[in-house]
Amino acid sequence: MPLISIQNAFLAFSDLEILKNAVLYINKKERISLIGKNGAGKSTLLKVINKNQELDHGSIIYQKNIKISYLKQDNPKNLDISIYDFIKNQLKKENNKEININTIVEIKKIIKTFQIDKHSLLSELSGGSLRKVVLGSALLSQPDVLLLDEPTNHLDINTIAWLEKFLKKFSGTTLFISHDRSFIQNLCTRIIDLDRGKLTSFPGDYKEFIKLKKENNRIEKTKKKLFDQHLEKEEIWIRKGIKARTTRNEGRVRNLKVLRKEYKNYKKIENFNNVIINEIKNYSGKIIFKLKNISFFIEKKTIIQSFSSIIQYGDKIGLIGNNGSGKSTMIKILMGEKKIQKGSIHFGTKLNIAYFDQDRSTLDSNKSILENVNNGREKIVLNGKEQHLIGYLKKFLFKPNQMKCLVKNLSGGECNRLLLAKLFLKPSNVLILDEPTNDLDLDTLELLENIIIKYSGTVLIVSHDRNFIENTVNKYWIFKGDGLINTHFSSHNNIIKEKNKKIQKKYVLNPIKSNISFLKTKQNQVKKELKKVLNEIEKIENSIKTLKIQMNEPDFFKQHIKNQLPIVKQFNIEEKKLEKILIYWENLEKKL
């Protein structure tokens, strides 16, 4: 017998159908991934299963004495409580009884795993740490069915890996919503697709699901095309009038009425269509940012320690590290919102930065969708072409009747789609994206990936979505903690493998001290050489700058060619020198 059975379920809010004659069986020890577009009703379905939302029609049957634990997408509102007391209170509420000594031990153990002080207040925690605590309380209640709504949001990569291992060992059933494709692929035993009110079951292989889903959509579009052709033919027939009134043709008239009803109820497959970004091409210089021995501290804590790097036009850099390791701080430094205490930053010329803020601070929750984008003006200009704002927003799957909807009434995914619509409208040659994948459905993720891949400017991304990072960047800044940042040119998967090997070797090998000192000496030599190279780069750039000033003089090209040539030749020589030395600098960084 299934743990939970949903039969002939109907649920609608106004004209939006969430469930339409839906059927679902949830069995023991399953790990089910619930997939669907933003606004399809995934979170609502979890609320139905958790008895927070009633069905309009249909039935839901639970196995006797079943225990369900539910991790919501939103964090708790009361934050003036210690971590330990919060988890203890949640468990009391779940179990309806006092906590025993074994549970206290388990609470302390899980808090230790998350590396957080148990006496800290929830209000003192970062978004990621708070998510860990809420997650911990849900896991400790030992339910038969665990409902998780976007459990990986705000979690760092190490914690996501820990969660995967935990859920694989978990003896109960898990039903989860997630946009993290690696998490889905590694974990689920079955996929449930919620699409236009229907629930369809697929085998638990995400890559195979994508193939099957695309094939299903292709077949559906073909059927719809044939249906439309048949309906059109019948409409032409009925308009002829006289023949349709005969008794013999009454059945055909009735069939036409059925076809019209089917057409009215039909919900088409919605996909992003021709979304482009307002890109300024070849407008900035080759060097976007040059960081030289930069350091940043908060009181006595080192966030960034003596970091040097050159970001060139076209670089796509992924910022990876645990929560609190300094990724968002680095973004704010590059945005000019925070000042470094040591070192220097050179900002490139004519930079136009488009910034995706994970806190959505650029959206006014009390204004409508239209008012938030382009200040509500009807026309927009995208890559030099004028178009209607409503037509532009429809490409991001916003319907015309939603345009006056207030942002505070939108789902998390809809807010992020709106933020992307606003971001792509801004003319840019640099994209800075701080956790852009949170709350996005899988189709929107794919759209964002494709846009970043095609974008010819510079991109910096903070994300814990392993697939997203792997598919979009060509260089990594690995934030180690204690201010240390390493640059890698390998793929993210290789970085993780390398890290795991090092952890294993740490407990197996006992390297000879002389080898360690040799490696340190070699590393110090590379660091010295890097300093020399950075100084040389600075000299060449200053030389290019001086030559440019001379060449930009109004009368420069009016003078005799003999006077022009030496300066133009020298300019070309310096440009080539800069190209070569930048390649040498990148190779040196790889050796660190």
From Swiss-Prot:
Its main location: cytoplasm. It catalyses: ATP + H2O = ADP + phosphate + H(+). InterPro entries: AAA+_ATPase, ABC_tran_Xtn, ABC_transporter-like_ATP-bd, ABC_transporter-like_CS, ABCF_ATPase, P-loop_NTPase, Uup, Val-tRNA_synth_C_sf. It is an enzyme of class 3 (hydrolase). One of its GO terms (cellular component) is cytoplasm. PROSITE patterns: ABC_TRANSPORTER_1, ABC_TRANSPORTER_2. It is found in: Cytoplasm. The keyword Signal does not apply. It comes from the Bacteria. It holds the Pfam family ABC_tran_Xtn. Its EC number is 3.6.1.-. CDD domains: ABCF_EF-3. ATP 2 binds at G321, N322, N323, G324, S325, G326, K327, S328. Keywords: ATP-binding, Coiled coil, Cytoplasm, DNA damage, DNA repair, DNA-binding, Hydrolase, Nucleotide-binding, Repeat. Probably plays a role in ribosome assembly or function. May be involved in resolution of branched DNA intermediates that result from template switching in postreplication gaps. Binds DNA and has ATPase activity. This is ATP-binding protein Uup. The gene is uup.
